């Protein structure tokens, strides 16, 4: 099993490259270049939404419990098997994860990611549930290996989201429009994430 030594986002990007992008593209009916662009925007969206949940005192305990009990990293370590539909169980319930984390923001998230990547609504709607178990699996894998403390998960996810927004100048607006906050306009990405993660 590969050892993850970077940030959550860095390690996800490392895993979601090359042939894996091609496999995901085939699943959602998109070419590799557009699939990669969509993944690069969708990962920060999911991480920011999870960070928002982790910052909510009423929801953080449930998120941490799910990571500890349902996501041991097996999805990450067996991506080929997972993407070919050979795995089952709570760890692979992408629809459930996306519905729980995004709730009524799911459709706006799909619309925003579709506009950014150029993929149609249906492709993005299929992509998010494919990625969600991989993201949760990475959190569980890093927690078990000592590379992530769930007590500081909000900070870790916030740092990753800021890094992604710095790399993609329009991503702050996309996240802000879907998850709340000021985007990259007045106040900038820091204020947007402060709103998302409950910091004033």
How should these model regions be labeled?
Residues 1-200:
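A structural "flexibility-hinge" signal
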């Amino acid at each position: 099993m590969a050892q993850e030594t970077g940030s959550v986002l860095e390690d996800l990007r490392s895993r979601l490259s090359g042939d894996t992008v091609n496999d995901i593209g085939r699943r959602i009916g998109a070419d590799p270049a557009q699939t990669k662009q969509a993944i690069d925007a969708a990962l920060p969206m999911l991480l920011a939404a999870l960070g928002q949940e982790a910052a909510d005192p009423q929801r953080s305990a449930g998120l941490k419990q799910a990571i500890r009990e349902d996501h041991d990293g097996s999805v990450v370590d067996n991506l080929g098997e997972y993407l070919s539909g050979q795995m089952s169980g709570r760890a692979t319930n992408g629809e459930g994860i996306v519905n729980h984390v995004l709730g009524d923001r799911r459709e706006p998230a799909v619309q925003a990611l579709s506009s950014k990547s150029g993929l149609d609504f249906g492709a993005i709607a299929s992509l998010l549930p494919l990625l969600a178990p991989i993201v949760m699996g990475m959190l569980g894998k890093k927690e078990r290996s000592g590379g992530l403390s769930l007590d500081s998960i909000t900070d870790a996810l916030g740092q990753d989201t800021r890094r992604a927004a710095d790399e993609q100048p329009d991503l702050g607006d996309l996240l802000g429009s879907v998850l709340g906050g000021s985007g990259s306009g007045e106040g900038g990405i820091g204020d947007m994430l402060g709103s998302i993660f409950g910091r004033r």
